[in-house]
Every structure is written in structure tokens, then in C-alpha cells.
């Protein structure tokens, strides 16, 4: 399984000065490099913007479980016209 493969790793990248947080995959699958962004979160004002959510259960759900209200979370990976139809903040 990917998360326990010693050749592939997940890395957390934090840019506190720019309020960006990324979880990336890095490694090798045979002779092909694996490199991609699983999660990209940015803090903008008082909202948490999720630009990329590649987790199976969703990082938004984990943030809600941690006590962050849905009104403070924007699903930025959805187009603006779709966001009002989610349970989360629009912008």
C-alpha cells in the first residue's frame, strides 16, 4: 500500500510566512518518479481554503472533526458557482 511503501513518502511542507500547507507524495514506482500534491491548504483572512484535497475521507471532514466550523472552511477546489451548494463557506 502506498502509505507504507518505503520507496514512496508523504512530506508535509509548511510556508508559515505565506500561510500555505501542502502534503505531497514523493518517491519512485519502478523507474517512474512519483511526485504530486495530495493536500494544499491556505489560510486567507479568517478562512481555511482547501485548494486540493486528495485524501480518501477528505481533509475538510478532518478539520471539522478537529473543531473547525464549516463556516470557516472554503472548498476552493470547487468553482464559485458550486460552493453555495455545499455545507461549507462560499468565500
What are these language model-derived features?
Residues 1-91:
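Terminal domain-initiation and capping elements
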Amino acid at each position: 500500500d502506498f502509505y507504507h511503501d518505503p520507496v514512496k513518502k508523504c512530506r508535509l511542507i509548511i510556508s508559515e510566512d505565506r500561510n500555505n500547507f501542502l502534503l505531497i507524495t514523493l518517491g519512485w514506482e519502478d523507474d517512474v518518479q512519483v511526485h504530486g500534491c495530495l493536500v494544499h491548504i491556505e489560510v486567507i483572512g479568517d478562512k481555511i481554503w482547501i485548494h486540493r484535497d486528495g485524501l480518501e475521507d477528505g481533509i475538510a471532514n478532518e478539520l471539522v472533526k478537529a473543531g473547525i466550523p464549516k463556516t470557516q472552511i472554503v472548498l476552493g477546489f470547487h468553482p464559485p458557482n458550486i460552493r453555495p451548494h455545499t455545507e461549507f463557506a462560499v468565500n
